[in-house]
């Protein structure tokens, strides 16, 4: 679809039109930046055993850096999204690259837990990784219309590409050089890559267009999204985001420590995390393709059911080979959940409100990851095993499933009323 907007002085609008060649190039740059910035999310799970040993921490306390990172990540997504809305995506990306560089160096030199948490939460989470996530998701949604689902899936796959790359790379350098040197080197790398790439994102997006109706989608154009008041619908999506990600965080945050406790070693756990997130890339892309055909709510329902099944599979199986298989299954089943929220909002809410609403729901998913990471560690400290933590994740996943089913029932009821009118 051609846009009539001219987004760069002296350049014809068609060059920077929606779904143009430049839009796909921009998507590739967004994917690369999100992959690099994802190091901020996956550094702590890999370094958790080393931090626990060096600072003499209990498992719950050792999980605290991940929790503050995800809280900062969530709050920073809203903050950086507003900065991007006002100044363009270039400003938060440059600031984020500099913050990641400073944050990893500061964390690598931290004398104790609280200094480490401060660097993780403020520089890496709030100002760093957050700038490479929500602003890029919102930016991508403005460059695509008919292929918005797959475009969002590709963009947000950077989160999982980073998860597939960073754990084994970091584990290698932690074993050979130590976690502190690994952090410092990672900070230098982020600074030297993200800031130059950000300059390729200077053109502003073309004018927003109306989201097209997806064949088979549950979207119904109404002043009442999903048959509910806007605040109620938004609140339910936020609670759903928290609950699905509390469940999702248990294997992602604790699989390395879980494998170490089982006697397989942290390196095997890092490999399982990489497998899990690598399969998440496949899941995210396939789910994006599916969502362009069945809509966001049905895609979220499918992901919620499959994630619950995968979590159940962790309970009876704790052998090395079986854990590799279950980790792959978990990654393959849950990768499409978070992108579905962005698509649901674009389908059921006005386009002019999409940026703020997407940022809020993504913040809640990240807060869910933070809560789940801490909660699983605390449950381990109380019970001495991860079985209760897995059961806790399954319960939160059931809450997510119940909310999605309720929203779908409201949509179908509203469609029925409109059909009889």
Predicted segments with their positions:
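Helix-loop-helix hairpin linking two adjacent transmembrane segments in secondary transporters
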Residues: 155, 159-205
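Cytoplasmic helix-loop-helix junction between adjacent transmembrane helices
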Residues: 120-157
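Extracytoplasmic gate region of multi-pass secondary transporters
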Residues: 44-48, 231-289
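Extracytoplasmic
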Residues: 25-59, 80, 166-167, 250-256
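Structural signature of the two symmetry-related core transmembrane helices
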Residues: 91-105, 298-313
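Conserved MFS/SLC helix-loop-helix module at the cytosolic interface between two early adjacent transmembrane helices
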Residues: 75-114, 291
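Hydrophobic core of transmembrane alpha-helices in multi-pass small-molecule transporters
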Residues: 35, 103, 115-131, 242, ...
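Interfacial helix-cap and linker-helix signal at transmembrane-aqueous boundaries
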Residues: 51-52, 83-84, 165-177, 259-260, ...
